[in-house]
């Protein structure tokens, strides 16, 4: 169970970010930009990176939710397991290997990053902008993992599926008038979980 009384077993990140817009509105815009904005990285690749980083951090909510989003874009759940087992032996096209090695190192040992880590991505014919996109995704999900785990939000299969459906269809945009429609969204969420 979450650590705060305003949260419950079906809570997700929006139950944190939508309750404090002055703090979290910029993060929502950043999320939309890095996960759905222009990039050499496809949406499914970005979602797989998010799930991978989250799995490395053992954040059950973010792993489950972003794997569910990746599944909506036809990414197999087995692929995440393969990447966690051995990036180079996974069924992913090898051109992606340097990206996942970089994500692994930036997540597990960030102070050890060196020029060679960037050069490996560039040698695989990815652009410098893609490296920056990757840095933003990895950094953001390290933050989100700690935000969710710090609040005690673990999620469950139904929460992950709802997140997968919502994020694959609507992305990460949050309307400026969210405070006005949040009660309606909360009722819809309750109905979804009561079914």
Name every feature range the model reports, one short phrase each:
Residues 1-195:
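Hydrophobic alpha-helical segments
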